[in-house]
């Protein structure tokens, strides 16, 4: 599939059910991992290094979580020119997610609506896939060829749907224990709209309790593994300024290393009247750009300079990526833009950020 220009592949993919197209893409990327072709793609990655949270990112454009839920195609995705790739969300136990259909295209708006519900194969399978990747094996074997600035890997964690919200912290800590030694950074997903009550973890007391427990567990993990893995928290766009301030204060108070802004939105204002606009789930793509940038700007004002922000939501062009940096983000992630415009968007965005920001 890597041999086919995306402009030719897209009509075929868009003729399929959206989730079938998603699964086909993931399988194709998994099959091409480690090939000379994929490694060749990786050598053309835009070189624009930046150091944040103690990590040196090869460039400022990454893949958002959600495309590779089970860490099956880390190498294939990394070869698209990303500076970093985030996989997951993973939960302690395997779960099927919500019933199909659960992914919908809104092409007139360059948008998607999903209600996947953290469908994944569980932590044990997820970590086996991470360890089986060329990415991981190269890090373990200094005799294998390594790029001057290797791809960075974020592992995104969540809670099982069956876990009561009052016990959510247990799931996050279980996942943190499992992913910690292998991640360049850990992303704590408390903002998916597709797991019941998950977003309540963004409220003042619940967030303090969760982040306090995560910070405490990390102290033990640092002692156990001899490394301090940065922890980022992923938040929603459906927040007002006072809620953003509460979250920013909690991030600082508990020593979190960064924030990912934002997840999908529940708002349908920008897509009213379009087919599938009334489907339940999170809306991503072009309609989220302004909402996400607003939250990024509010976070930057609340957190001040120097606190790492990963901007995600609505990046459909290189100019959109630059707008996130100018709103206050340090790094940018892409997902829905990749579906609509293909891998060329990665390098276009990274190149324009390099020359404009």
From Swiss-Prot:
Gene3D superfamilies: Aldolase class I (3.20.20.70). The keyword Oxidoreductase applies. PROSITE patterns: DHODEHASE_1 (PS00911), DHODEHASE_2 (PS00912). Its cofactor is FMN. It is a peripheral membrane protein. GO terms for cellular component: cytoplasm; plasma membrane. It is found in: Cell membrane. Its EC number is 1.3.5.2. Its main location: membrane. Catalyzes the conversion of dihydroorotate to orotate with quinone as electron acceptor. This is Dihydroorotate dehydrogenase (quinone). It comes from Albidiferax ferrireducens (strain ATCC BAA-621 / DSM 15236 / T118).
């Amino acid at each position: 599939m890597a041999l086919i220009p995306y402009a030719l592949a897209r009509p075929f993919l868009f003729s399929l059910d959206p989730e079938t197209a998603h699964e086909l893409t993931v399988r194709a990327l998994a099959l091409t991992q480690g090939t000379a072709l994929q490694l060749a793609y990786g050598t053309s990655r835009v070189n624009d290094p930046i150091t944040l949270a103690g990590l040196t990112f090869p460039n400022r454009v990454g893949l958002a979580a959600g495309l590779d839920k089970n860490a099956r195609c880390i190498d294939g995705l990394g070869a698209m020119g990303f500076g970093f790739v985030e996989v997951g969300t993973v939960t302690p136990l395997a779960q099927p997610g919500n019933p199909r259909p659960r992914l919908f295209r809104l092409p007139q708006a360059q948008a998607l609506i999903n209600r996947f519900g953290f469908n994944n194969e569980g932590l044990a399978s997820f970590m086996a896939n991470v360890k089986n990747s060329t990415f991981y094996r190269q890090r373990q074997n200094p005799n294998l060829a390594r790029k001057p600035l290797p791809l960075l890997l974020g592992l995104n964690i969540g809670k099982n749907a069956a876990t009561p919200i009052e016990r959510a912290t247990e799931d996050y800590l279980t996942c943190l224990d499992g992913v910690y030694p292998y991640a360049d950074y850990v992303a704590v997903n408390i903002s998916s709209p597709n797991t019941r009550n998950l977003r309540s973890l963004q409220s003042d007391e619940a967030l303090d309790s969760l982040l306090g427990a995560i910070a405490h567990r990390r102290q033990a993990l640092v002692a156990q593994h001899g490394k301090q893995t940065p922890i980022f928290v992923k938040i929603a766009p459906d927040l007002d300024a006072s809620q953003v301030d509460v979250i920013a204060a909690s991030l600082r108070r508990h020593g979190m290393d960064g924030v990912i802004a934002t997840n999908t939105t529940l708002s349908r204002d920008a897509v009213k009247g379009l087919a599938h606009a009334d489907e339940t789930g999170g809306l991503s793509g072009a309609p989220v750009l302004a909402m996400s940038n607003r939250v990024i700007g509010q976070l930057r004002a609340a957190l001040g300079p120097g606190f790492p922000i990963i901007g995600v939501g609505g990046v459909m062009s290189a100019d959109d990526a630059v707008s996130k940096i100018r709103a206050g983000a340090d790094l940018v992630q892409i997902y829905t833009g990749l579906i609509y415009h293909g891998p060329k968007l990665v390098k276009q965005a990274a190149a324009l950020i390099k020359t404009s920001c």
